[in-house]
Structure formats: C-alpha cells, structure tokens
C-alpha cells in the first residue's frame, strides 16, 4: 500500500510540474497558475500545496525524502502491474521519468528535484 500511495504522490507531483512548465512556455505567470491550481477543486492536492508551492517560492526547498526512495516505490508499482498483466501506462511512464531523474541528478537528491526535468529546459 505504501508503494501505491507514493505512486499517486509521484504522479501528481510530476503532473503539476509539467502543467507549470507548459503554462510558463505559454507565457503564464507561475504564481498565478499555482494559486489557480490550489483554489480549483479539481486539482487541489497535497503535492501542489505542500511541495510545488514551497519549491517555487524557494528553489532551495526540500521535502526530506530522497528521490531514489520515490523512484523505487514507483518502479515497484510499475513492475507489480506488469507482473499481474495490468494495463498501467501511467505507472510505466511515471516510473521511466522518476528513474531518469534519479540517473540524471542522483538518488540522494530530494524528490522535489524531479522538477529539474521540466524547468532546466524551459
């Protein structure tokens, strides 16, 4: 169950960063987008208010959880789904992204550093 909960957290976290990256490329203000995400009932979630918002306010912000730990849990979910022959394209892609971040930035980095996949090129 822990791995499944962390998979939800991991997918919501990278989805928020991807949305912010696309909006930034479109010319939208990061703070305005973030406030809209927090206020909107359909996208209110813990990763946005407890991780993304503090990270955008202070790029030195950390959550205290290593990137490698979240990457491992997401891989467990993707591997479990594959072993059970479940259709799980989101878990597969989410696992690939977290594994890529782990390889690029190092597993000891904070999980919030996954944002660098989007913001180093935006």
Residue map of PLM features:
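Helical "substrate-binding/catalytic lid" subdomain
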Residues: 1-122
């Amino acid at each position: 169950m822990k791995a499944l909960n962390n998979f939800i957290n991991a997918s919501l976290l990278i989805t928020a960063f991807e949305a912010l990256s696309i909006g930034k490329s479109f010319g939208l203000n990061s703070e305005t987008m973030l406030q809209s995400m927090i206020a909107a009932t359909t996208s209110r979630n813990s990763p946005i208010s407890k991780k993304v918002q503090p990270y955008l306010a202070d790029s030195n912000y950390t959550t205290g959880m290593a990137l490698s730990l979240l990457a491992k849990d997401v891989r467990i979910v993707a591997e479990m789904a594959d072993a059970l022959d479940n259709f799980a394209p989101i878990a597969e892609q989410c696992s690939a992204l977290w594994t890529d971040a782990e390889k690029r930035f190092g597993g000891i980095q904070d999980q919030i550093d996954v944002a660098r996949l989007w913001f180093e090129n935006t």
